């Protein structure tokens, strides 16, 4: 039996603007297992990014629970949430959000610096990760000197620097050409297998999602249950 890492229990999310209520998520239940690679697919506006943000404590559910390793993420202090984000979760976005004035090495090491780790040890770990993603020769380059695919590889290494239990990726290949996008997905799979890190990847591309261990579909705020699970 697989060990459950993250549980989403009856999560709903709505926004209110005066008398108008917009329902974004409706009673979503989901389990993410340790070390698995899960894709969530759906069209724009289906609610998949909102779900990912709630899983990462970047947005709060209107109702329901999210538990990481048994800990209810919305019953802890904001300080504890910040600690969880930095220590137990990694994030990858469509746009890399690298700090432009810092080198690839410094960008990867930054979350470890924020955590208060020894700078020399943090940079040593960052070097190992950059070599692992094929950028050992680009460590001293700033983001403007890197290609789009290289910048996203730096972002993946940064997401892994604190050895998170779970990495949440929101359209990680959405800003890349097809070849670079495929390379990023292969890298995610390779790293997940090597490190035992769980990945949840939100994407609109079913072909890329099919490479993951499991895929689920969001539609109009509902998580579709595969026929095999019904």
Swiss-Prot record:
A GO BP annotation: transmembrane transport
Superkingdom, taxonomy of origin: Bacteria
Broad class of enzyme this protein falls into: translocase
Domain ABC transporter: 6-230
Keywords from the UniProt entry: ATP-binding, Cell inner membrane, Cell membrane, Membrane, Nucleotide-binding, Translocase, Transport
Annotated GO CC locations: plasma membrane
Oligomer and partners: The complex is composed of two ATP-binding proteins (LolD) and two transmembrane proteins (LolC and LolE).
Name under which the protein is recorded: Lipoprotein-releasing system ATP-binding protein LolD
Native source species: Shewanella oneidensis (strain ATCC 700550 / JCM 31522 / CIP 106686 / LMG 19005 / NCIMB 14063 / MR-1)
Gene name, Swiss-Prot/TrEMBL: lolD
């Amino acid at each position: 039996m697989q060990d459950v890492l993250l549980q989403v229990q009856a999560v709903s999310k709505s926004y209110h603007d005066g008398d108008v209520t917009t329902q974004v998520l409706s009673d979503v239940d989901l389990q993410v297992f340790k070390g698995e690679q899960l894709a969530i697919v759906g069209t724009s506006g289906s609610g998949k990014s909102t779900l990912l943000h709630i899983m990462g404590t970047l947005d709060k559910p209107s109702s329901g629970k999210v538990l990481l390793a048994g800990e209810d993420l919305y019953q802890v202090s904001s300080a504890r949430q910040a600690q969880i984000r930095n220590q137990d979760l990694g994030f990858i976005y469509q746009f890399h959000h690298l700090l432009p004035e810092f080198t690839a090495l410094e960008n990867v090491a930054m979350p470890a610096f924020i955590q208060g780790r020894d700078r020399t040890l943090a940079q040593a770990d960052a070097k190992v990760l950059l070599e692992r993603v094929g950028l050992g020769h680009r460590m001293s380059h700033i983001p403007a000197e890197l290609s789009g695919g290289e910048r996203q590889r730096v972002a993946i290494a940064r997401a892994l620097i604190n050895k998170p239990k779970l990495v949440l990726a929101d359209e990680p290949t959405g800003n890349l050409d097809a070849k670079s996008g495929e390379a990023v997905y292969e890298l995610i799979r390779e790293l997940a297998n090597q490190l035992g890190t769980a990945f949840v990847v939100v994407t609109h591309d079913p072909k890329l999602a099919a490479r993951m261990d499991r895929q689920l579909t969001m539609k109009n705020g509902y998580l579709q249950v595969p026929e095999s699970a019904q």
